[in-house]
Amino acid sequence: MENTSHLPPNEIPKKMLSLDPFSQWLGIKILEVEKGRCKVAMTVRKEMLNSMNKAHGGIAYSLADTAFGFAANTHGKYAVSIETSINHIEALNEGDYLTAESVIEKVGNKLGFHIVEVKRGEELVALFKGVVYRTSKDWKE
């Protein structure tokens, strides 16, 4: 028998993280969730540094992308990214504790537009923008 029980918005990111070994490797933790918004955090580790001894640009991008994906899916439908971009504002260092908060700016039947702020404390270090396509598939328990 198929499970037709829908997951509540705040449970969807938890399920997504449990199925996401890459985000687990990054050490991402979910801090806050509500429909259309998700805040996550992680700490930059030595193995995340590039040849200049700064965090690889993909680290901030990956944190932002995870927050974006989690927030986009809180509407209960599988949502997949179709376009993303990031502005790296400040270099990141080993030991930096980063947060990324994704807020949906506009959502339609099929598309959702998000802004993600990546911060080190109160300092904005990256700004990510993303568009998702919302499928008809429901998140279920």
Model-flagged regions — what are they?
Residues 1-141:
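Terminal targeting signals and extreme-terminal segments of soluble enzymes
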